[in-house]
């Protein structure tokens, strides 16, 4: 990706909000760590909200190493009024990053166990559904394409039928782009 961004002179925005939630045996590589040239034409966003379960604080931040790009990003944020979070959000974020290591140490094995349960259940009980291999985070993808081919349903109709007839509300993958069609997102953070 970095080579293509350089070749076509494209700025990369790397959404790294799930970067702290990585399962053992896997590694997250921040885009900005790929080298100076990659960092010159990129910026990354992240937040404590996913890792520490504090989305209500509405806090996120951008890391923009290159000065001229940083100024453009700051100007864009200023135009939409997104310049500073409130004091509670700042203090909550600082507390999460300063004192949240124990939380994260317990969260990751919990999520890994939930993922393994879902993958096992899907494999043994849901013929035609495949759990997509997962390296971290609390959102798992379930591949329903085989069922869609057999049923003749399109992704939107299938998602609607899951909600209305199956009483299961998953996030339909097609809303995340055409490659997501036929997949559904499942939040595995809850018991």
Regions found by a protein language model. Give the residues of each.
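PLP-dependent class I/II
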Residues: 1-191
